């Protein structure tokens, strides 16, 4: 079960911060450091006491970053523009299992059949997707002793110090989270794993009609708008439109509200802005995914194509994002008279194969060809072989295929895994047919030996 931390507010008064630290400090700290009054002289007096004793410095700075800084980080973390897509903190484990149960099958009423099938089991069609923790990073910043000394010279100096420390770390974390979310969308778009619909961005009325139709379509049960191909729907209140700033500037709130059959106030709560689906910080992403063999760096042309996408309509549950760990640590370097502060961040980034999503594309999506790799293979009876379908597309057309075999003893799964029966012989043509354009297909010829 995931939980979202409560947003807590913190006054920017140094006196309040100092007293909050004192309230949870050790007995030794409280014996030396009195309660602070909200005036500059009192704060300077406390500063002199703390700066005179290294042990008090360490306890003060540790509490400042770990306790007070955590309040600031937590409150800001759940105020970012894409916060509605985050699930919260993952309380247990590092893996999330997402389960989808298909609709029950209908049966014809027949008392005669009932006599024979009363105790027959009907196993439900259950599909699962596993999402694993895949983001473990830390961020680091340094506080010099002089920074600590200066914090006690003004009424808001202590608060400014903790803000200075945490803002660097938080900004990095928030920016990276946003970049990864955009990268996930880009990867699913370029792989053809999001349903697409052509939209005329040069005509606002036409665009509004197309978006309204898409929103209405999601209200009905369908298997066309999610990666797993399960039959599901998305309620209006669970629909969110991610819209780039350029397209948003051409659309009035009234038009969009009409498109999604919402009041203008309701629409604002379901509209998420993005600077551009191709506005990826390639250098930063390269650092984040360094050493990851699955990371793909987009070319300039690919990023420009992504930036042409005006909007994507997603189910509230499309993104599967959990925080697992968000922890501060600090360490004093007595030789250098400074403290290093570390923010460790563990997250789970994924998307749901069962949640609906529709991308609005300014061009016409097409499938130009399908090839199967390998194109030919010799397989012994009783063995298996995994085939790969490569689907060439334009304008982010879906790349999913349907596998089929012309030999009943040589079967192929939906994932392209070929199984050769021990009694099979001869050849089998394994075909991969594009679901988006059934006129496009590729074939592998299997020879059984």
Question: Whereabouts are the PLM-identified features?
Answer:
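Short glycine-rich, low-complexity/disordered patches
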Residues: 32-33, 76-84, 178, 189-190, ...
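Extended, compositionally biased alpha-helical segments that mediate assembly or anchoring
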Residues: 2-66, 273-365
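Long, hydrophobic alpha/beta structural blocks
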Residues: 127, 135, 148, 192-219, ...
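Hydrophobic, Leu/Ile/Phe/Ala-enriched alpha-helical segments that form helix-helix packing faces
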Residues: 68, 169, 173, 215-218, ...
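Extracytoplasmic soluble-region selector
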Residues: 364-449
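Extended oligomerization regions of viral-like shell subunits
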Residues: 209-321
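Long, contiguous amphipathic alpha-helices that act as assembly "spine/axial" helices in icosahedral shell
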Residues: 125-197, 337-343
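Assembly/oligomerization interface modules of large self-assembling protein complexes
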Residues: 57-141
């Amino acid at each position: 079960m995931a939980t979202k931390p409560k947003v807590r507010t913190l006054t920017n008064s140094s006196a309040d911060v100092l007293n909050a630290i004192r309230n949870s400090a050790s007995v030794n700290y409280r014996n030396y450091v009195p309660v602070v009054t909200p005036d500059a002289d009192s704060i300077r007096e406390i500063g002199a006491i703390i700066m005179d004793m290294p042990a008090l410095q360490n306890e003060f700075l540790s509490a400042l970053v770990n306790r007070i800084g955590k309040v600031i980080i937590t409150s800001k973390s759940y105020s970012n523009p894409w916060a509605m897509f985050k699930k919260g903190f993952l309380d247990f484990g590092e893996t999330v299992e997402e389960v989808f149960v298909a609709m029950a099958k209908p049966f014809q009423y027949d008392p005669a059949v009932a006599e024979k099938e009363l105790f027959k089991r009907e196993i439900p069609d259950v599909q699962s997707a596993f999402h694993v923790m895949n983001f473990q990073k830390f961020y680091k910043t340094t506080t010099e002793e002089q920074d600590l000394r200066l914090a006690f010279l003004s009424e808001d100096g202590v608060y400014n110090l903790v803000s200075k420390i945490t803002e660097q770390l938080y900004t990095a974390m928030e920016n990276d989270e946003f970049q990864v979310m955009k990268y996930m969308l880009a990867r699913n778009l370029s792989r053809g794993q999001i349903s697409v619909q052509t939209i005329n961005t040069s005509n606002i009325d036409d665009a509004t009609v197309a978006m309204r139709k898409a929103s209405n379509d999601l209200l009905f049960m369908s298997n066309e708008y999610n990666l797993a191909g399960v039959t599901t729907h998305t309620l209006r209140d669970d629909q969110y439109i991610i819209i780039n700033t350029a397209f948003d500037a051409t659309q009035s709130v009234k038009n969009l509200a009409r498109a999604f059959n919402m009041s203008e106030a309701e629409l604002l709560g379901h509209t998420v802005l993005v600077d551009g689906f191709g506005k990826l910080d390639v250098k930063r992403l390269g650092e984040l995914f360094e050493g990851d063999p699955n990371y793909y760096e987009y070319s300039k042309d690919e990023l420009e194509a992504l930036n042409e996408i005006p909007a994507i309509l997603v189910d509230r549950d499309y993104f599967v994002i959990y925080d697992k760990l968000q922890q501060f640590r600090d360490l004093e370097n007595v030789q250098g008279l400074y403290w290093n502060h570390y923010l460790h961040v563990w997250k789970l980034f994924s998307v749901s194969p069962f949640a609906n999503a529709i991308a609005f594309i300014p061009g016409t999506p097409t499938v130009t060809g399908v090839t199967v790799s390998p194109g030919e293979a010799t397989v012994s009876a009783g063995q298996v072989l995994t085939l790969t379908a490569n689907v060439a597309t334009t304008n982010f057309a879906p790349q999913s295929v349907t596998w089929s075999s012309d030999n009943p003893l040589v079967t192929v799964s939906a994932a392209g895994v070929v199984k050769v029966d021990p009694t099979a012989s001869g050849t089998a043509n394994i075909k991969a047919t594009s679901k988006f354009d059934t006129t496009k297909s590729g074939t592998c010829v299997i020879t059984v030996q």
